[in-house]
């Protein structure tokens, strides 16, 4: 079973003004202490940019790099998406990663001010994503497109349009898919062959409803506990896993619980304790299959 952690579960995000950022050495050490042996990259500059230094840091903590997340403007030709994808692909390939996870950001670096694209912007986005897939493939990587709150592909309708407009693999993030109004299990049932990477998140639906209604921003909802440890929220994580298994999914399961910190947590508390719960829950559902 291919299971990985991600720095976002320790509050490390690329979003502007997200919160307090823990040092890489502590985050990687806690991942390994919990039993993870793989991780995603984290935001630009979080791990060393130098390939040798990055590999040494990961090896020192007994971890391998499996994927990296890039949020780039894909619908506007004024932004050099191809350059950013090329740079990210080279960085990931030099570290032995397998997947480049791409989201369709808006300029500004926030996930709190999304909007719908017009027809011309949609065509540009689809074309740019197809170009990004070619770039990733040229570096030996799989491109997995990530629907995400506050981006150009966020809602259930956006996801449907994306699946119709491209043949690119999907990063199935159970939290963001649900937040956008779709059921993750339904995506697996109708488009299992498109799932190339998985971010497993659990969601507190009462908080999600406040995001959908506009009562709170996405960032504030994360601070209020939008995401729970796996098995502690309201999503049918076991059902999603079961559908993926029956569909023959062979990729990575990245256990995520996006969080935003204000201070350094006590050792093995906060994010580490939450990640431990998720890993134990995932072990239980995998063990009975």
Identify the function of each model-found stretch.
Residues 5, 38-39, 127-234:
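Acidic/histidine-rich catalytic cores of soluble enzymes
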Residues 5, 31, 39, 58, ...:
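Conserved, mostly hydrophobic/aromatic
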Residues 8-11, 42-44, 70-75, 105-107, ...:
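Active-site beta-loop-alpha junctions enriched in small/polar residues
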Residues 9-23, 72-82, 114-122, 229-232:
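Active-site mouth loops of central-metabolism enzymes
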Residues 49, 70-87, 106-121, 213-214, ...:
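Surface-exposed, active-site-proximal loop segments in enzymatic domains
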Residues 60, 77-171, 179, 272-274:
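Active-site acidic/histidine proton-transfer and metal-coordination neighborhood
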């Amino acid at each position: 079973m291919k299971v990985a952690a991600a720095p976002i579960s320790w509050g490390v995000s690329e979003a502007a003004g997200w919160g307090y950022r823990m040092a890489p050495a502590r985050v990687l050490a806690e991942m390994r202490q919990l039993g993870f042996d793989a991780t995603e990259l984290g935001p630009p500059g979080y791990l060393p940019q130098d390939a040798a230094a990055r590999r040494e840091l990961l090896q020192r903590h007994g971890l391998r790099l499996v994927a990296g997340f890039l949020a780039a403007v894909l619908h506007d030709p004024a932004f050099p998406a191809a350059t950013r994808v090329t740079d990210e692909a080279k960085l990931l390939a030099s570290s032995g990663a397998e997947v480049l996870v791409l989201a369709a950001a808006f300029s500004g670096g926030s996930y709190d001010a999304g909007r719908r694209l017009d027809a011309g912007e949609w065509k540009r986005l689809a074309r740019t994503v197809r170009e990004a897939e070619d770039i990733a493939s040229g570096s030996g990587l799989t491109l997995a497109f990530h629907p995400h709150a506050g981006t150009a592909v966020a809602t259930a309708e956006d996801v449907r349009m994306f699946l119709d407009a491209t043949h690119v693999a999907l990063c199935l993030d159970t939290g963001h898919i649900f937040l956008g109004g779709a059921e993750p299990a339904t995506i697996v049932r109708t488009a299992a062959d498109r799932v190339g990477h998985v971010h497993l998140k659990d969601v507190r639906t009462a908080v999600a409803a406040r995001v959908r209604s506009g009562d709170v921003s996405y960032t504030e909802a994360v601070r209020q506990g939008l995401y729970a440890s796996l098995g502690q929220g309201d999503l049918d994580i076991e059902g999603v896993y079961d559908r993926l298994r029956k569909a023959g999914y062979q990729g990575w399961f990245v256990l995520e619980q996006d969080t935003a910190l204000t201070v350094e947590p006590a050792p093995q508390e906060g994010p580490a304790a939450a990640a431990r719960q998720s890993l134990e829950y995932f072990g239980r559902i995998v063990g009975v299959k």
